[in-house]
Design a protein with these regions (language model features):
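Mixed-charge interfacial surface used for oligomerization/domain docking
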Residues: 3-5, 10-40, 83, 92, ...
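Class I S-adenosyl-L-methionine
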Residues: 40-95, 100, 107, 114-115
Length: 316
């Protein structure tokens, strides 16, 4: 009988997942992203609480001179994960990796996985998103492994969720978006001059884009809330997961204060965003993660083509 191991990149926030996931997350291994800040190197999720990290970022006087950055895991780190679980008797491995639009990590892990094709069936999934929604894909995959599901069925469920989940966030300040090159030229200048706050969103191709903008954070929060309500539509509360997510908490109280007006009711604990995400967008972003739960009447997509491409299997 096959043994399937689930792995997730550290950006999936499993290290700081809510208590309800305490037992199941222990079954999932983590490939860690490197972080460089104030002359020191860290592995994400090891020895650095994200809340403390964001407090430090908020108080940095010279942001440009102290700009943190990230680095991919090394070949040795990724190979060690594969070798360890293959040696432990696992013949199938699913890796959930942060969106390929956010850097080369997904592709790098996929290339390392190719070196082990003769030893195990390894599939590296592009989550097309990051933070805890990425981690939730890994948690769902682990739940399915525990129920005895095989890799193709797990990937079908993952692809359905990827196609339906949504994230949107309001960034109170543009400093990190500008310095990291995500906001450039005239848009950057006018944005700072006019106190424009972008409402950012992961499209279903996995790209972090500006969905729309507003003058001032309150107007941006209102636009974000209205968009969220539109996405949810008439879907019943038991058919989705909804929670707040943030880097720093500067806007969380204002976010909560608007919720009654828009009849927004979260049904899951808040989850802090990964430090790697904060490095790119800054410590002043708040948002919502909306995760539909597939109903029996909602059809699964076919087994994704990347399953056959990465494993060498032939589609039936």
């Amino acid at each position: 009988m096959s043994r399937i191991k689930i792995v997730c990149t550290s950006t999936g926030c499993l290290d700081y997942a809510p208590e309800q996931y305490e037992e199941i997350k222990k079954k999932i291994d983590i490939i860690r992203i490197h972080m460089f800040f104030q002359g020191k190197e860290y592995l994400e999720g090891v020895g650095f609480d994200p809340a403390d990290f964001y407090r430090i970022m908020e108080n940095v006087k010279d942001v440009k001179g102290n700009l943190p950055h990230t680095g991919m895991p090394t070949h040795e780190e990724v190979a060690e994960v594969f070798e360890r679980w293959i040696a432990a008797g696992y013949d199938k491995i699913i890796v959930i990796a942060l969106s390929s639009y956010l850097g080369g990590t997904w592709n790098f892990i996929r290339l390392v996985a190719k070196e082990y094709q003769s030893k195990a069936e390894i599939v590296v999934v592009d989550a097309k998103i990051t933070c805890f929604q990425e981690g939730q894909l890994a948690l769902m995959a682990q739940e399915m492994v525990d129920r005895g599901c095989d890799v193709p069925e797990i990937l079908q469920e993952i692809e359905w969720r990827k196609a339906h989940q949504e994230f949107l966030g309001v960034d109170e300040r543009l400093d990190y978006l500008i310095l990291n090159g995500r906001l450039k030229g005239g848009k950057a200048f006018m944005g700072k001059a006019m106190n424009i706050c972008p409402v950012v969103h992961f499209n279903h191709q996995g790209e972090l884009t500006s969905l729309f903008s507003a003058i001032g954070p309150n107007n941006a929060l209102k636009k974000a809330a209205a968009q969220l309500v539109q996405w949810i539509g008439a879907r019943k509360k038991e058919d989705y997961i909804l929670y707040r997510t943030f880097t720093g908490k500067s806007l969380v109280e204002r976010q909560q204060a608007l919720e009654p007006k828009f009849e927004i009711v979260t049904n899951h604990p808040d989850v802090i965003m990964s430090c790697v995400t904060g490095i790119n967008v800054g410590p002043w972003i708040v948002g919502y993660a909306y995760v539909p739960i597939r109903r029996p009447d909602e059809e699964l997509p076919p087994v994704p083509s990347y399953y056959y491409e990465q494993t060498g299997k032939i589609a039936e």
